[in-house]
Every structure is written in C-alpha cells, then in structure tokens.
Amino acid sequence: MEIHRALSSEHYSCSSYLTGHSHMNDEGGMTKEKLLSFESVCREHGLSITPQRVAIYKELISSAEHPSAVTIFNKVREYFANISLDTVNRTLLTFQKIGLAKVVESSGDPKRFDPNLEPHHHFRCIRCGKIVDFKSKSYDGLEIPPELDNKFVVMEKIVHLEGFCDKCRAR
C-alpha cells in the first residue's frame, strides 16, 4: 500500500503523528476508508502519495471545522518544518480539482476547505467565521429560474446562509 510506504519512508520522520495523535484516531474505520479513497483518487490523477500530501489530507479530514490553508499549514509544519504555506495551499487546491475536497468561499474571507463531499449546505457566522454544515431537502429541491435553466446546466445546488451563531448572537 502506497500510503503505508509514504508514512514509513525514511524521509517521513513523524509517522507517529499520523498514527498516534488522538485527533487523528479513527472512528469506525472512516479515516482508513477515506485514506484508501485518497490513495485511489491520487493514483487516478497521476499524483504521488507523499508524506506531506498524506499529512495535509489527514489534517483536513480530521478537522471539525472548515479549515483554511493557514490553519492546516500551522498544524502540518509542526511535523514538516520546511513545508511552505504555498505548498499547503496548492495541495489543497489540487485536492479540490481532483474531488477530494470542496472550497467554501465567502465574501472577503480566505478560502476554507471542506472534506465533506456529500450534498449539504453551509451556514457561516459573520462575526466569528464559524461554518456549519447542514442538510435541507427544501433547499435541495430549489427550482432553477427559467432564465438560468435555459442558458446553463446546473451541476450542484449549494445554499450558503450567513448570520450570527448562537454564541455570537448572545453577545
């Protein structure tokens, strides 16, 4: 398995990072399943499975937030001191292009990345920036206006709501 080789390679001095840290521990096989999918998708697109890519992907899928490149960079550089923010950002954008992540953009904020590839929508707090995933059949069923339907092919419906989260609303 290529991921195992990447993690155990002599160039990867922190394999315990990916296997021993509690925030990286697997719940119900999900991380292992996602890593196998990661390996398969990378191979399909001709990408090498490097320890840095594995670390970036594991940070992304283990995050309860929708992390920015800076957030992931700050975590990964603890283990890869020479990794650059540009490398992390380009890697995350590559993950988006090959279908391993989605980009969540909002007005004026840096791009945030979402490993949840299932259909869902987002709520973003305009004060603290927290992003929460939610599902809604009514939003999924939104009708496409005829003026758009005649000119475009809609591939995905994503609703992005903005407001105040419960903590910020209480302030």
Regions found by a protein language model. Name each.
Residues V88-I98:
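Basic amphipathic alpha-helical segments that dock to polyanions
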Residues A69-F80:
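DNA-recognition alpha helix
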Residues V41, K58-S63, K75:
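Short amphipathic alpha-helical elements of helix-turn-helix/winged-helix folds
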Residues K32-G46:
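Short, Lys/Arg-enriched N-terminal segment that forms or immediately precedes the first helix
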Residues K97-R171:
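Non-DNA-binding regulatory cores of transcription-related proteins
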Residues V54-E59, T71:
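Pre-recognition alpha-helix immediately N-terminal to the DNA-recognition helix
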Residues I49, S63-S68:
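Short capping segments at the starts of secondary-structure elements
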